[in-house]
Each structure stands twice: as C-alpha cells, then as structure tokens.
Amino acid sequence: MVEEVVLMKGNEAIAHAAIRCGADGYFGYPITPQSEVLETLAELKPWETTGMVVLQAESEVAAINMVYGGAGSGKMVLTSSSSPGVSLKQEGISYIAGAELPCLIVNVMRGGPGLGTIQPSQADYFQTVKGGGHGDYKLIALAPASVQEMADFVALGFELAFKYRNPAIILADGVIGQMMEKVVLPAQKPRRTEEEVIAQCPWAATGKAKGRKPNIITSLELKPEAMEINNLRFQAKYREIEKNEVRFEEINCEDAEYLIIAFGSMARIGQKAMELAREKGIKVGILRPITLWPFPTKAIAAYADKVKGMLVTELNAGQMIEDVRLAVNGKVKVEHFGRLGGIVPDPDEIVTALEEKIIK
C-alpha cells in the first residue's frame, strides 16, 4: 500500500496505521466507543496481506494476556478498549510493565464511573498517568487531538515502547475516536522477519535460542533485594523518559496573559475559545500536553511568572489540574473547568469560565 489521503474516523485510523506500520498482532474485545478499531481490522483482513494476526478474544482479560505473550516474543502487538475494558486489563498491563515488554494500548475513553455512558470523557487521566494497576510502574501516555494524530501516534507509540521496553498507551476521548477528518496514511512497512526480531530484541523469548542463551520473561523476584534492584532500574528508566520524551504544543503563548491548558478534544474546543477570547481583547494562549506522561512540567512552570492565570479544561471533575498546580508551585492562579457524564462543552462556556474564575 502506498501513501494515501483518506477521510475516516479516529478509530479507523488506529486500525489502518497499525497495519501500515508493520504490526504483528492485535488482540481485543469490542466495547463502545472504540469498537471500530476491531471492526476495521476485521474488514481489512491484514492476515491475507501482511500476515498480521487479528483476534477477538473472549474477554478484555484474555486480550491483554495475549498481548503479554506476543510482546514477550518481541512482536509488535497492540490492544484497544474503552474505560471499563481498560480497567479489566490493569493486572496484565502491570505484568507487562514489570516484565519490561513493549506493546501499545489504546483507550478511547467513555463516561464513568462504573458502566457509565458511551459518550466521551477524559476521566481516565489518573488511571493512565498515575499507574492504574498495582506497583510502581509508568506508561508512556500519548494524547491525540486529531484523527491524524490517532494514526501518527500508533507508529510513535511502538517506537517509544521498543526504545524503552515499556508499554505505551494512546489516551483518546470518544470525540477523537468517533470524529471524521482527513488523514494522510503512510506507505506500508513490511513486518519484521524472525531474524530481524531476534537481532533487534535480544531479550525476547522467541523459541529460537541457537547461538545465545535462553531468555525468561517474568516480573517475579522472590528475593526482596532483587526486586528492589529491579524497581530502581525501572525508576532510572522513567527518569530517562522524562528527560527525553516530553512533548507539547503551544499556540499564541508568546503574548498571552492567560493560558488554557487542555488535551485531546478539549484542546480543540479550547483553541476556538482562545480565538473568541482574543476577539474580546483577552490575550489567551493554549498549552496542550501531547505526552500526559512524561508531563510537560517544566514547560508549564516556565509560564508561572509570565501569565496572570491558567484555566485547565477537561472532560472530568479535575484530574490533570493537579499536575498543573504542582508544576506552577503556587506562583499563579490555576482553576478548573470541566463537564461530566459525556457532556461536551461549547467554546463559549470556556470563555465564560475564564472570565468568571480567572479574570474577575
């Protein structure tokens, strides 16, 4: 397949991008609002073209453990789900992180808690960036704000996951998953050969250990001293990721007196709110975290002495705002605006919140 421009949903872009970047396998289970990922993969039948395995597992728990096995053999494997489904995967995600294996997870968030609603939400921020499963681990978290980024972040997620031997997650809300936009899809990359996998992943359990010692994939250490050494190594790796992989976008921040800080679809809505505010003479800029972890702490802190206030806008009751407040360390006023239960706000609501909570 050659590079092409297509109109499609964010969920569909995930499926197309996974095939085109040379992924070896997808294991998932349908749940709204991300079901189109699995549906599109089934329609495209990549097992007939690239040899990519696509399997609907019997449950979310089964799917994440299939990913664990595929990742342990050095394969490029991914799964996708939506909020309650990702909760079911948390034990497996922790095991994968503890075994230092690369994989890609996609969460197209819906409203909660509990079964909640199929409408969009951003209420899984804490679960994603603070470690939803047990133990001290981190996920490299990418937050797309367009259908193009949904496609682009598949390849980027795999790249970072293999670079650091750590799971990566694309955290999208239901708006981004369901909206349709023009997407530039890259040309098809071939899947890696078995020889390439062995050469690139010397840690993998491939079943072909000729010329090298066998590998054991595990997160288990019975001796606490050994477990502490493992954990200290993990933490050193996380510090390296924080040093090298922070990504964010700034819009009209040079002369801004106020900042809107938002990710995903709220950053898109916030951009229109910024334009409306500037029409009223209010100098507003947007800072959009692209990596939710590692978080752009230093970038936000740099504005603490430059702006009069920051409004954090999220589709939740206030989660990312905690990291923003930690970043500015009390040097500037930080307030929150959010809608819950699947309600998506208008740009005018954000302007009103800015005027009432920050500017007043």
Model-derived features: where do they sit?
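N-terminal glycine-rich anion-binding loops that anchor highly charged ligand groups
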Residues: V6-E43
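Glycine-/acidic-rich phosphate or pyrophosphate-binding loops and their flanking alpha/beta elements
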Residues: K9-A13, Q235-Y258, Q271
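Thiamine diphosphate
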Residues: E36-T128, L142-F162
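Structural signature of the thiamine diphosphate
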Residues: L139-E196, E349-K360
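Conformationally flexible catalytic loops at phosphate/diphosphate-handling active centers
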Residues: R165-E250
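Generic long, charged, amphipathic alpha-helical segments
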Residues: G270-Y303
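Peripheral docking tails and interdomain loops at the edges
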Residues: E314-K360
